[in-house]
Amino acid sequence: MKRMIALDGAQGEGGGQILRSALSLSMITGQPFTITGIRAGRAKPGLLRQHLTAVKAAAEICRATVEGAELGSQRLLFRPGTVRGGDYRFAIGSAGSCTLVLQTVLPALWFADGPSRVEVSGGTDNPSAPPADFIRRVLEPLLAKMGIHQQTTLLRHGFYPAGGGVVATEVSPVASFNTLQLGERGNIVQMRGEVLLAGVPRHVAEREIATLAGSFSLHEQNIHNLPRDQGPGNTVSLEVESENITERFFVVGEKRVSAEVVAAQLVKEVKRYLASTAAVGEYLADQLVLPMALAGAGEFTVAHPSCHLLTNIAVVERFLPVRFSLIETDGVTRVSIE
């Protein structure tokens, strides 16, 4: 019988990252775990619908035995079974992030007995989680270089707080993992601005694009009007294509916040990324830790290691026989496997 791993949910960022990472790693390694103090660092601690959906999805995919899987629970026991490929559908029932549920279960399906399709309904444009276009255009091309083949499709947008979005991913078992080396991003090739609108006046998007264009030389400026029933909602994105990597940054519009202020938040984030020579942004760094650990080697550079990143590394090191090295040089942090 494999040893039970005990985790403290208040560790590090004190949010849902510990739980999501633990679920992924437990399914992959077969090691059971308990976690207490789930989301202890949040104003509303315990399992929300998004986290509960991730737990139930993980349990279904590997036929796990679970205790404490209920809304508001701050303690969970998860004893995994064998990961099975198949066609899965999960509904969050709120505007909780579809992509965070997918990111919990997809790594386990890299080790399944056959190809899978996972469809999740809920929120697709959520201020606290990467949107589907980030997964599709930034993360998945890098995963493909590592020998991981998955394809995400956004079937319907669902903006916070209403939800109603649908995202699906097709994924195949991984034959072998390749290492990823992302020490430098290289020169910028082009930058693309994009605005999504649903039930919001077009002039909002035009003002947001104008704000982006006032700070950056944009090779493309795209405005996409979605059906009104997918809103109301507004997301502004800026994609930075460099020689070695494409990064994508986003901000979700809010009621009573002007278009200029929304876009200015995005400008500030992109300028912070461009001010350093780091290849990887904050969100992407979180997502690369697990596949890099499974490959057993690789490296990337990030401007500042976030609390999410450090928490993720700590959980990975509890489940896998790897150790990460973080070395700061010339204003960037180089993250690698020792």
Swiss-Prot record:
The active site is at 308 (tele-amp-histidine intermediate). Its EC number is 6.5.1.4. Its main location: cytoplasm. GO terms for biological process: RNA processing. InterPro entries: RNA3'-term_phos_cycl_insert, RNA3'_phos_cyclase_dom, RNA3'_phos_cyclase_dom_sf, RNA3'_term_phos_cyc, RNA3'_term_phos_cyc_type_1, RNA3'_term_phos_cycl-like_CS, RNA3'P_cycl/enolpyr_Trfase_a/b, RPTC_insert. Signal peptide: none annotated. GO terms for cellular component: cytoplasm. It catalyses: a 3'-end 3'-phospho-ribonucleotide-RNA + ATP = a 3'-end 2',3'-cyclophospho-ribonucleotide-RNA + AMP + diphosphate. The keyword Cytoplasm applies. ATP binds at residues 103, 283-287. It comes from the Bacteria. Keywords: ATP-binding, Cytoplasm, Ligase, Nucleotide-binding. The keyword Ribonucleoprotein does not apply. It is found in: Cytoplasm. SUPFAM superfamilies: EPT/RTPC-like, RNA 3'-terminal phosphate cyclase, RPTC, insert domain. It is an enzyme of class 6 (ligase). One of its GO terms (molecular function) is ATP binding. Catalyzes the conversion of 3'-phosphate to a 2',3'-cyclic phosphodiester at the end of RNA. The mechanism of action of the enzyme occurs in 3 steps: (A) adenylation of the enzyme by ATP; (B) transfer of adenylate to an RNA-N3'P to produce RNA-N3'PP5'A; (C) and attack of the adjacent 2'-hydroxyl on the 3'-phosphorus in the diester linkage to produce the cyclic end product. The biological role of this enzyme is unknown but it is likely to function in some aspects of cellular RNA processing. HAMAP family: RTC (MF_00200). NCBIfam families: PRK04204.1-2, PRK04204.1-3, RNA_3prim_cycl. Belongs to the RNA 3'-terminal cyclase family. Type 1 subfamily. This is RNA 3'-terminal phosphate cyclase. It comes from Escherichia coli O9:H4 (strain HS). The lineage of its organism: Bacteria, Pseudomonadati, Pseudomonadota, Gammaproteobacteria, Enterobacterales. The gene is rtcA.
